Structure formats: structure tokens, C-alpha cells
Amino acid sequence: MSKPSNTEVTIAEAESVKEEKKIKLILDRAKDHGKLCPVRDIIHRISDKWSLLSILTLGTHGTLRFNTLKKEIGDVSQRMLTVTLRNLEEDGFVSRKIYAEVPPRVEYQLTEMGQGLMQQALQLADWANTQLPQIISSRNKFIKNK
């Protein structure tokens, strides 16, 4: 096996420094905003059982009415979907449009920011699918060593 060239080492070091700076910036922002850490706050908000499913479903289907969205997601209760959509709307990921009709019609769709979040969620899902065999292997080794 050959030694890495000076150029390869320099590029790797530069990437490492860039990542360290990015992490430091994120952690410094958390300190500057007191208890509002942007990473912790957003991850907490979207890591519940229904938020990402709602975002991915709206991203796949576009504009949906409440009952259609509920049906597409599956076994979510009406109350939990209502709470989830309110939280996503409050954070600016989902928009809600109410039509003055009888019966009332309410439609939901992703905002531009919600579409951006969906793209990030898809990258995470791709990574998880790629890493799944290794994760399962690690879990099995951990269980055997307990």
C-alpha cells in the first residue's frame, strides 16, 4: 500500500478543519441563543413518530386534504395528525389553506422550507438504507457481547 501524497493529506486536513469549524459554529450558536439550540430544537420537533412521515407524504403527493393525508400515512390518529400538522405549520414547514365551503375544506402542502427539509430527510434515508447491514451487524455483535 502506498503512502498518501502531500496533496491528499492536505485536502483531508482541510476537510477536517472545515468540518471542525462548522461544528464549532453550530455549538456557538447554541450558546448564543441560550436554551434554543437550532439543531436540538429542530431535531426534537421533527423526530417524533409522525412529522417526517407527514413531510414525506406531502412531498410525494403535493397538496392533500386532511383525511387523505391521514389515510396515506396510515395508523395515525386524527388528534396526533392535527398536533403534528400544527407544529409543522408553526415552524414553517407546512402551509394550510382553508376554503370557505360547506363542508369546510382544508388543504396542506409543504412550504419551500418544508421541501428543503424533505430533501435532507431523503439524504438521511438514503444513508440509513446504505448503512443498514452494518448497523444490524453492529447491533448483533453488541447483543452477543452483553
Sequence positions of predicted segments:
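Canonical helix-turn-helix DNA-binding module
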Residues: L64-Y99, P103
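Basic, amphipathic "hinge/linker" alpha-helix immediately C-terminal to the N-terminal HTH DNA-binding motif
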Residues: E101-L124
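Exposed, interaction-prone assembly regions rather than primary DNA-binding/catalytic cores
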Residues: R139-K146
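Generic detection of well-ordered alpha-helical segments
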Residues: D48, L52, R86, Q115, ...
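N-terminal helix-turn-helix DNA-binding core of bacterial DNA-binding proteins
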Residues: D32-M80
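N-terminal leader segment of winged-helix/HTH proteins
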Residues: M1-I46
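Alpha-helical linker/hinge and terminal dimerization helices associated
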Residues: L56, D91, Q120-I135
